[in-house]
């Protein structure tokens, strides 16, 4: 009788462990699926940003930023908030025309915040002299999910060459 009780207890403990492992596996799978969905949404945002840059379209850039977004261009002052960000991009687009592609190195999501590291490569047409030059930058995006949408909260880049 004593042995039967021990076997029954062991069997119950084993079943409980298997159930816990199954729950952990299900939670892990669900988290992976959520991460994949979030990363896909961020990729879409980054490629929309690339398209807006290539079109030199301030009106397509601005909605991609949060209301308090910060643009930190290389060799220029930081722009904070929609008005300054708009003025910065208007100036940039008056000076150059980009033709670039983005290559995503890394996206890390943590709740409603994420960061992305990218490299952009292509060409830049300088309006002042009509010259086209090679363009290659590395970028860091800090992203924030607001109202269910990923947006650029902070963005900075520097030239690689």
Identify the residue ranges that each predicted region occupies.
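Positively charged n-region of N-terminal signal peptides that target proteins for export
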Residues: 1-5, 18
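Hydrophobic helical h-region of N-terminal Sec-dependent signal peptides
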Residues: 6-10
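C-terminal motif of bacterial Sec signal peptides marking the signal peptidase cleavage site
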Residues: 14-16
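Short, low-complexity N-terminal intrinsically disordered segments enriched in polar/charged residues
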Residues: 18-67
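Short beta-strand edge/turn micro-motifs at domain boundaries
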Residues: 22-23, 136-161
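Hydrophobic pocket/interface hotspot
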Residues: 49, 61-62, 69, 81, ...
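A short gly/proline-enriched turn/hairpin at secondary-structure junctions
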Residues: 70-80, 92-95
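Surface-exposed, charged secondary-structure patches
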Residues: 90-128
């Amino acid at each position: 009788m004593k042995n039967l009780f021990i076997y029954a207890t062991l069997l119950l403990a084993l079943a409980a462990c298997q159930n816990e492992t199954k729950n952990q596996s299900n939670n892990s799978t669900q988290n992976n699926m959520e991460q994949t969905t979030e990363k896909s949404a961020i990729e879409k945002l980054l490629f929309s940003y690339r398209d807006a840059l290539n079109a030199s379209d301030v009106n397509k850039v601005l909605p991609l930023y949060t209301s308090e977004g910060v643009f930190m261009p290389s060799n220029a002052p930081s722009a904070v908030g929609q008005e300054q960000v708009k003025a910065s991009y208007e100036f940039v687009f008056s000076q150059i025309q980009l033709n670039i592609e983005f290559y995503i190195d890394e996206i890390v999501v943590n709740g409603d915040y994420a960061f992305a590291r990218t490299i952009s490569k292509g060409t830049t047409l300088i309006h002042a002299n009509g010259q086209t030059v090679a363009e290659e930058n590395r970028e860091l995006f800090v992203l924030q999910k607001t109202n269910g949408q990923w947006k650029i909260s902070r963005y900075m880049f520097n030239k690689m060459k």
